[in-house]
Amino acid sequence: MRLGVISDTHGLLRREVFDVFREVDHILHAGDIGSLSILTELEALAPVTAVYGNTDDWDVRARVPQVAQLQLDGFEIVVAHGDQFGSPTPDALYAAFPDAEIILYGHTHKPLLTLVDLVVTVMNPGAAGRRRFDILPSVGILELE
């Protein structure tokens, strides 16, 4: 199963995302969506699981949860924006969600892929929206096998 992982769009969905996510089976959005229209556009590509972030308005918060826990292709996955942990770290996320095998988060705008305790994959796809903090926009692809 091929997952598209995105976060921090802040109301901007770049055209490049459509090329990168063209053949994904599911899209996971880790918050700071910015507008419900972003989810509508992503849903045209694949099913979407999303969470809200600290900058999302009440329309977005009414539609998606703060944390999503789901099982895809036999893996226990948690999606959270991460702002509830201040400046989220892989260790803090693992401590909060000890049953997860994969934890996806956003908020920091910094891409990261790491393994915690040799058992839990923690991924931050970076920010896909407007460029901030001198970091280039990014998204991620996660292949489940």
Regions found by a protein language model. Name each.
Residues 1-48, 56-69, 74, 135-138:
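N-terminal active-site segment of His-dependent metallophosphoesterases
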Residues 49-91, 95-99:
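Helix-adjacent hinge/juxtasegments
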Residues 1-4, 69-78, 116-122, 144-145:
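Beta-strand-turn-beta hairpins that frame and shape the catalytic cleft
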Residues 37-38, 42, 58-61, 78, ...:
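Short acidic/glycine-rich loop or secondary-structure boundary segments that cap or lie
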Residues 49, 85-145:
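Conserved beta-sheet core of the metallophosphoesterase superfamily
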Residues 5-7, 26-32, 49-54, 79-81, ...:
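Active-site neighborhood of phospho(di)ester-bond hydrolases with catalytic His/Asp-centered motifs
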